[in-house]
Amino acid sequence: MARWSGQIMCFRVGHFLLVGHFLLVGNFLLTDDSDTFSFVALGGGREVGRSCHVISFKGKTIMLDAGVHPAHSGLASLPFYDEFDLSTIDILLISHFHLDHAASLPYVMQKTNFKGRVFMTHPTKGIYRWLLSDFVRVTSGAESDPDLYSEADLTASFNKIETIDYHSTMEVNGVKFTAYHAGHVLGAAMYTIEVGGVKVLFTGDYSREEDRHLNQAEVPPMKPDILICESTYGTGTHLPRLEREQRLTGLIHSTLDKGGKCLLPVFALGRAQEILLILDEYWEAHPDLQEFSIYYASALAKKCIAVYQTYINMMNDNIRRRFRDQKTNPFRFKYIKNIKNLDRFDDMGPCVMVASPGMLQSGVSRSLLERWAPDPKNTLILTGYSVEGTMAKQIINEPNEIPSAQNPDLKVPRRLAVEELSFAAHVDFQQNSEFIDLVDSKNIILVHGELNNMQRLKAALLAKYRGLKNSPREKTIYNPRNCEEVELAFKGVKVAKTVGKMAEEKPHVGQIISGVVVQKDFNYGLMGVADLREHVGLSTSSVLERQTVTVNAGVDLVKYHLEQMFGYVEMRETENVKIEEMEDDVAEEEEDKEVKQEVEDVTMEGEVKDETAEEVKKEEEVAEEFKQEVEGDSDTSAGTTFVVMNSVTVKHTPTSCTIEWVGSCLNDSIADAVLAILLTVDNSRASVKMSSKQCAHSHGHEDGHSNSSLDERVLQLSSILKAQFGDSYIVSEDGKSANIKIDAMEATISFSDLSVTGSPPPLVQRVQVAVDRAISLVAPLAQKLSAVDLVEGFKAIENVKDREENGEVKAEDEEKVKAEEKVKEEE
């Protein structure tokens, strides 16, 4: 299985990333260094409210939720957006429509440099528009805090939001994400996200208990590497659903019997519909209560009920069965009256009021609280989670007085009863722990929980998984604060699929294959250059570069300097094509003349045309001048060509050298080196020394830089191994192998394929490394000497030895000497 080696060079073309040329051996498996997954909580870290988390991996950035803090207002309620560059975010996923998860989305989309795409489920988008419109109405006009955004900003952001169906997978720039049912509220979703092979599960707010209209949260089929999980209730435990409902209806029934009023602060959407279903069914079963009115006070009451009536098919079997069998819509309540405000509310006698907002910070629920607080017959039932810093959290402690919303200095006496009965549809410890077991993720990041609850949950989980420590299933748990970064290292292993002509040929182990790796998002393809247009849509071209420099040096000097740098330079003679062509033309012309002359001689019946000696001499002079002219012109066309590293050609003429190469990073580097050498040939001291003559005549000298023959290299290889291992290196009698024996350890080198066998493995590995290094040492830089060449060299040496023993070599040498003497005599 091959790994990448060497230096990676890449450049981007459109959506594709071309990763140079690489050599791969065996299977095409890409491995790279550790990649870091980053998680930052801009909100919702060790707190409940303004949920906003950012994950980054492999150059992709995803934001999860964009809410506000219900205990604050204005800019103070926003997540810490200033701590992150929002322009780098590719995708923003909204889990559900609650204000602490979605209310700052218009601010992000319209007031910042955010450029990504936003996704949420269809019901969430349907409710988002009306819920945030009410949020703008309630929060606008405050003198102390500027408005976060306007109605126009909300409308503009709404038009940019895209929707996703449950169980459908979408892909954006290589990031895949899928929505699953999360329970909690209508349209709530948990998301599985896959980025560069790393799988993440973000639960958002979720419930593992089926209620009257929603299914419980699903367990995604994939096993995530990272779980981002809510910790709202920490280690707390909920009452069973039926017991909670009985206690709720019992409290309401007893309050009405004693002539009091019941106030149930809720969010306008979500848990309010669940409570209304419970109350409507209870009133149907108890005719004695039907004289008391149930009010649902919300400016969005009718609009929101219409949304719930629209998305019945996304609810549980109970609601769909009632809709199918009874032919009625369960959300068309029989005993519940909708009111937008308190202007026409007849505050006389016992009643039940379900009013928003749920945190009692302002609005109808806060007004009624201050109005009903002094009467001990009244009851306040908190059905949702109370966030730290809100009136709902404060009144749980049952203070004697509460401040007025309009004038905090004005105190209102509290005499009404306060009961907390959670219908918040969040998981308790048992449900959360079971879900974490089913998901079975090694890395768990806790969010959306107050500090104490989150720390208790972390401690409980660590105690539960203590037995998995130092095992493959060991779990790591994080509970970061806001703006604290969590980094997790993942080693990515990616497979490059061969396509095109390269995929048609089945490679064998050990084969070297050259191609281009093309990356699109997180997918890799290995193909030949010729297949780029067909499979990727990219056109290719080769740039032939040429440069001519003045070089006043002969062929020998140029060859000498190139060999000093590159070790081996292939030399090719450039034939004088011009002279040969002209001589051929002259020969053909003369042949035509002879044929023509023969024809004339036949037709003239033996007549012979006399030519004077002067005319013959004149023609000979013209031919001689023509020949000299041709030979003079041949100096510019004849020359020598050198090939350096099989990539750069150097055409040498008496006055210049022309360098040609196909443009690439490697070829450009070689060409630069060749050019630098040619520019220094003239003034090099070595050139002066070599070109000077110690005698008046010119003759050849021994070339000290000539390339060694194959036989010499084979002997050099054996000498290197002998020097490395000393007396332990012994060549076998047949010369086909060599043994290296050190104490009880022994390794054998086979000269047939230059393989090493023996034991123990460390010795075999060391000997193999020595053989490989020796092979690379006996050949020049530019000439690759394969094991096959060396094996042939060994065979040639053995053949010569055998022939010497048989006397064949001596006879051949004598015949060769006689042949040379005969040639000299003939000369």
UniProtKB/Swiss-Prot annotation:
InterPro entries linked: Beta_Casp, CPSF73-100_C, MBL, Metallo-B-lactamas, RibonucZ/Hydroxyglut_hydro, RMMBL
Key words, A-Z: Endonuclease, Hydrolase, Metal-binding, mRNA processing, Nuclease, Nucleus, Zinc
Residues holding Zn(2+) 1: 96, 98, 184, 205
Enzyme Commission code: 3.1.27.-
GO terms (BP aspect): mRNA processing
Active site (UniProt): 426 (proton donor)
Top-level class of the enzyme under EC nomenclature: hydrolase
Listed GO MF terms: 5'-3' RNA exonuclease activity; metal ion binding; RNA binding; RNA endonuclease activity
SUPFAM superfamilies: Metallo-hydrolase/oxidoreductase
Region (Disordered): 583-621, 802-827
Ranges of compositional bias, category Acidic residues: 583-592
Subcellular location(s) per record: Nucleus
Family: Belongs to the metallo-beta-lactamase superfamily. RNA-metabolizing metallo-beta-lactamase-like family. CPSF2/YSH1 subfamily.
Function: Component of the cleavage factor I (CF I) involved in pre-mRNA 3'-end processing.
Protein name: Endoribonuclease YSH1
Species annotation: Yarrowia lipolytica (strain CLIB 122 / E 150) (Yeast)
Gene for this chain: YSH1
